[in-house]
């Protein structure tokens, strides 16, 4: 696996992990269009199941008290700033259930079930639509045509931080770190086979508070099919962040047998009070 540590992000109010030799993209328009909601997937028909013997009823586990839930979370998160209180709509028990910090907020982060600890499994050209190759629920997918039989597969989704269990005072006063990570296949289909674009948006989902764009070029060394990691941490981005718009592109090439793809896996967006 090859790790790409990039850091020169576009947009003010951010610090990056460190330097790296990557090709940066020009700034995007200030108001990127949020992805439309994907159509709901139809529910599969229910099949009658054979009668099963009744299992003995087990007692439900005891729910933690509000004080115990607070203690458990603060042990996990670390101390908060003095005076930071929960809004009335949230309780510590609800936060313990949602766990909005230190977890991946993206839906279907590994749609094709690929293991990054092994080389990308060999695959040939295919004529099957991408949506039939895995579970892409939560992603909005489109194709961007290029020249010379090439194209981008563009996948994006928008994370609602308040809906995930975070709250305004935490985001504005603490400004926890927001970490974005992704893995792409070194497919050798072109010099640049992957792009990452992330916007931190205000409540209107149009005002850009901070952004990061990167188009890495791999070294070309080693066997093809290895996984390359891209990551970035947003810090000190300023108050008002309510949404995270995550978008990545993977390059394809049309061949006689169909489309040969660059695969992406283990995409993640997470929020941390400490790293």
From Swiss-Prot:
A GO CC term attached to the entry: cytosol
Q: Which InterPro entries match?
A: F-box-assoc_dom, F-box_only, Galactose-bd-like_sf
* Protein name, as recorded: F-box only protein 50
User: What organism does the UniProt record list as the source?
Assistant: Homo sapiens (Human)
Record carries keyword Cytoplasm: yes
Pfam families to which the protein is assigned, alphabetical: FBA
Q: What does this protein do?
A: Promotes cell proliferation.
Q: In which tissues is it expressed?
A: Expressed in the esophagus, oral cavity, skin, tongue and reproductive organs.
The Gene Ontology biological process terms listed for this entry are:
ERAD pathway; glycoprotein catabolic process; positive regulation of cell population proliferation; SCF-dependent proteasomal ubiquitin-dependent protein catabolic process
Provide the protein's localization.
Cytoplasm
Q: Which UniProt keywords apply?
A: Cytoplasm, Phosphoprotein
Where primarily located?
cytoplasm
Task: Return the SUPFAM superfamilies for the record.
Answer: Galactose-binding domain-like (SSF49785)
Chain positions with Phosphoserine modification: 31, 37, 49
**The keyword Cytoplasm is assigned to this record:** yes
The FBA domain covers which part of the protein?
95-273
What highest taxon heads this organism's lineage? Answer: Eukaryota
Point to the regions of Pro residues compositional bias: 26-62
Q: Where is this region: Disordered?
A: 1-67
């Amino acid at each position: 696996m090859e790790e790409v540590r990039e850091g020169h992000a576009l947009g003010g109010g951010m610090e990056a992990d460190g330097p790296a030799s990557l090709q940066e993209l020009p700034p995007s328009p200030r108001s990127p269009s949020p992805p439309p909601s994907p159509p709901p997937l139809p529910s599969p028909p229910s099949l009658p199941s054979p009668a099963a013997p009744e299992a003995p009823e087990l007692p439900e586990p005891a729910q933690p008290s509000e004080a115990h839930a607070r203690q458990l979370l603060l042990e996990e998160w670390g101390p908060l700033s003095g005076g930071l209180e929960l809004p009335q709509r949230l309780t510590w028990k609800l936060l313990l259930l949602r766990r909005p910090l230190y977890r991946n907020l993206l839906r279907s982060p590994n749609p094709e079930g690929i293991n990054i600890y092994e080389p990308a499994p060999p695959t040939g050209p295919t004529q099957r639509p991408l949506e039939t190759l895995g579970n892409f629920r939560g992603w909005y997918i489109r194709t961007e045509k290029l020249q010379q039989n090439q194209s981008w597969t563009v996948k994006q989704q928008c994370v609602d931080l308040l809906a995930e269990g975070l709250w305004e005072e935490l985001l504005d006063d603490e400004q926890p770190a927001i970490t974005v990570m992704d893995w792409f296949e070194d497919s050798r289909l072109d010099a640049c086979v992957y792009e990452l674009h992330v916007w931190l948006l205000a409540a209107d989902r149009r005002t850009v508070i901070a952004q990061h764009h990167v188009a890495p070029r791999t070294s070309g060394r080693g066997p093809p099919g290895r996984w390359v990691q891209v990551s970035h941490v947003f810090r000190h981005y300023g108050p008002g962040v309510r949404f995270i718009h995550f978008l990545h592109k993977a390059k394809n090439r049309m061949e006689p047998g169909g489309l040969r793809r660059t695969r992406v896996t283990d995409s993640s967006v997470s929020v941390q009070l400490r790293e």
